[in-house]
Curated annotation (Swiss-Prot):
N-glycosylated. Residues 352-363 have a biased composition (Polar residues). Residues 1-29, 98-121, 181-192, 236-251, 319-374 are cytoplasmic. This is Translocating chain-associated membrane protein 1. Belongs to the TRAM family. The lineage of its organism: Eukaryota, Metazoa, Chordata, Craniata, Vertebrata. GO terms for biological process: cotranslational protein targeting to membrane; protein insertion into ER membrane; response to unfolded protein; SRP-dependent cotranslational protein targeting to membrane, translocation. It is a multi-pass membrane protein. Pfam families: TRAM_LAG1_CLN8. Residues 334-347 have a biased composition (Basic residues).
Length: 374
């Protein structure tokens, strides 16, 4: 996000700058229209599609279960309207966090433009990852996923979801869809847009795939696992911006990143490659939401494996580049040993050295600051 300069003159109404400065208020007014529509009988039927979850089914109580009937949900085309409304909510929450939390910290810390953008990105994502991780863990515990891992593939297709499960997926889709207009609202640099589009697109592809293919149980577990690792990275980057000597969080993140990729592959192969492959019903049936056929299973495993390989390749490539730059920087310091300035040069080499762990950005490290200034 670019640093906004305060001006005494207010921009013209509906101008480019006006929309950027007041986009949260504009979106709030649009969301308020849907909420006000619930108050009138004529518009209530249309507004309720946007605000509440659709496609609920009430199942009668059984002797083994509780005496009360259960209300479950499945997905449909009307979910797009619900996702749109909560996308507006995500934009509003994004603006609130930015204005009342991150901007205040930025004024105190006096970050550079590069750090300002990275700090805002990590601040927003760490808040989202923490919330989604806690929420997802609550669903896993309440629905006994931890005590019985076979629930990941047993009784497939999982076309009926609880309220918490469906609302979780609707919220995930809404959040990552809101990231597209945020690229405009936050004045993202053109060179950063392709990276952001790939980043957002991968999230939407996998979340929507798990939702539409009725693999919501597996998708929930993998999302919680991935969000926890990503939360650790972004919270470590926030601490790094406040104190550049902080590196322990990145070292722990590097270990958990590799473990997270391995667990993702193990759970995916165990669920799709073994659990669903041994299921009795392996016929494609759109009416019941059964996609347990060989072609779909191969496509699911291929997409997961390719994505994990891409993430590991980016991780290894970044680490190798950092270690190569660290070695190249230390080599001249070892060769040059002037007698007069020996103590001074060795001190500079220690200050500018990098320990090889992953930091927030190569441009943000103290060593690169030294190179830029020179």
């Amino acid at each position: 996000m670019a640093i906004r300069k305060k001006s005494t003159k207010s921009p013209p109404v509906l101008s480019h700058e006006f929309v950027l400065q007041n986009h949260a208020d504009i979106v709030s007014c649009v969301a308020m229209v849907f909420l006000l529509g619930l108050m009138f009988e004529i518009t209530a039927k249309a507004s309720i599609i946007f605000v509440t979850l659709q496609y609920n089914v009430t199942l009668p109580a059984t002797e083994e279960q509780a005496t009360e009937s259960a209300s479950l949900y499945y997905y449909g085309i009307k979910d797009l309207a619900t996702v749109f409304f909560y996308m507006l909510v995500a934009i509003i929450i994004h603006a609130v966090i930015q204005e009342y939390m991150l901007d205040k910290i930025n004024r105190r810390m006096h970050f550079s433009k590069t750090k300002h953008s990275k700090f805002n990105e990590s601040g927003q994502l760490s808040a989202f990852y923490l919330f989604a991780c806690v929420w997802g863990t609550f669903i896993l515990i309440s629905e006994n996923y931890i005590s019985d891992p076979t629930i990941l593939w047993r009784a497939y297709p999982h076309n009926l979801m609880t309220f918490q499960m469906k609302f979780f997926y609707i919220s995930q889709l809404a959040y990552w869809l809101h990231a597209f207009p945020e690229l405009y609202f936050q004045k993202t640099k053109r060179e950063d847009i392709p990276r952001q589009l790939v980043y957002i697109g991968l999230y939407l592809f996998h979340i929507a795939g798990a939702y539409l293919l009725n693999l919501n149980h597996l998708g929930l577990v993998l999302l919680v696992l991935h969000y926890f690792v990503e939360f650790l990275f972004h919270i470590s980057r926030l601490f790094y911006f406040s104190n550049e000597k902080y590196q322990k969080g990145f070292s722990l993140w590097a270990v958990l990143f590799v473990l997270g990729r391995l667990l993702t592959l193990i759970l995916s192969v165990l669920t799709v490659g073994f659990g669903l492959a041994r299921a009795e019903n392996q016929k494609l049936d759109f009416s019941t939401g059964n996609f347990n056929v060989l072609a779909v299973r191969i496509a699911v495993l291929a997409s997961i494996c390719i994505t994990q390989a891409f993430m590991v390749w980016k991780f290894i490539n970044f680490q190798l580049r950092r270690w190569r730059e660290h070695s190249a920087f230390q080599a001249p310091a070892v060769k040059k040993k002037p007698t007069v300035t020996k103590g001074r040069s060795s001190k500079k080499g220690t200050e500018n050295g990098v320990n090889g762990t992953l930091t927030s950005n190569v441009a943000d490290s103290p060593r690169n600051k030294k190179e830029k200034s020179s």
